[in-house]
Amino acid sequence: MDLAEYKGIYVIAEQFEGKLRDVSFELLGQARILADTIGDEVGAILIGKDVKPLAQELIAHGAHKVYVYDDPQLEHYNTTAYAKVICDFFHEEKPNVFLVGATNIGRDLGPRVANSLKTGLTADCTQLGVDDDKKTIVWTRPALGGNIMAEIICPDNRPQMGTVRPHVFKKPEADPSATGEVIEKKANLSDADFMTKFVELIKLGGEGVKIEDADVIVAGGRGMNSEEPFKTGILKECADVLGGAVGASRAAVDAGWIDALHQVGQTGKTVGPKIYIACAISGAIQPLAGMTGSDCIIAINKDEDAPIFKVCDYGIVGDVFKVLPLLTEAIKKQKGIA
């Protein structure tokens, strides 16, 4: 394999029902940083039905080129068909790097493509960089149960591939004046490429604001002791007053106190709210991996030596069952809520 033939950092853009996912923009922002470092260009691959109008949004967020596969057969995600499209693109265009969102779709599509192309894939990256040779991407991710951060490279194969969780990187500001090239491609598909059939989309319900969309998250850990603070008690009350969502550590979810949809951390969701209030969360690497993208972290913990105090913006040493109700009442007073 002549590595010099492979050019371009490409984001596999993800859209749902005609709307681009924010993770696609976040990856484009990071792709531009990497491309500027190694002197390469940024591209995006867009797949679906009636998706061509979305190409300009990708250009506005950093793509120099957008390759569009607009096909009625590709309206709904299909693992084998989408993988065939991406693999065909690789053989035709020879990209250097594929960046994929660590979403439900990305976690399915990325490994399938990597396996087909006989290359490596680093999953759930929290940081991207460039090796000293200015050619090899350095993928950083938690390892050994989240106790260390591993740096992984793929020096001898192409494409270099990795998945990145939503909200790990900031979404860049759109530049409406940006220009780029939109290239329409034809998907070369047969019935054999569709090993599954889309039957029905069932959207999961859920009360309140989703944690991945929330501007404020009030999260609890093992120290909450029961489900009551999450469902009706102090965490829920504070989140409701702030118009936010309730989050939880893995320990709280494993204890059965709250649904896994609320889990923040290495094995849960990665979030990037304006305010993250961590209640009785010690600050081990696992939950920190999901919250460090927050603009402001406020920690409440009775253990003054808890690791969370090393990463938070504001720390309160005290009993969360005493401190948080006082904080909630102060917010109510400030807002004029009875």
Curated annotation (Swiss-Prot):
Ordered alphabetically, the record's keywords are: Electron transport, FAD, Flavoprotein, Transport
Gene3D superfamilies in UniProt: HUPs, TPP-binding domain
Keyword Cell membrane on entry: no
The record's annotation in SUPFAM superfamilies points to: Adenine nucleotide alpha hydrolases-like, DHS-like NAD/FAD-binding domain
Database matches in PROSITE patterns: ETF_ALPHA
| Gene Ontology biological process terms, A to Z | fatty acid beta-oxidation using acyl-CoA dehydrogenase
Binding of FAD: at which residues? 275-303
* Family annotation (InterPro entries): DHS-like_NAD/FAD-binding_dom (IPR029035), ETF_a/b_N (IPR014730), ETF_a/FixB (IPR001308), ETF_alpha_N (IPR033947), ETF_asu_C (IPR014731), ETF_asu_C_CS (IPR018206), Rossmann-like_a/b/a_fold (IPR014729)
Note describing how the cofactor binds:
Binds 2 FAD per dimer.
Pfam family of the protein (one)? ETF_alpha
Q: Enumerate the cofactors the protein uses.
A: FAD
Q: Name one GO molecular function term.
A: electron transfer activity
Family recorded in the similarity comment: Belongs to the ETF alpha-subunit/FixB family.
Q: How does it assemble?
A: Heterodimer of an alpha and a beta subunit.
| Main function | The electron transfer flavoprotein serves as a specific electron acceptor for other dehydrogenases. It transfers the electrons to the main respiratory chain via ETF-ubiquinone oxidoreductase (ETF dehydrogenase).
Under which name does UniProt file this protein? Electron transfer flavoprotein subunit alpha
Organism field: Megasphaera elsdenii
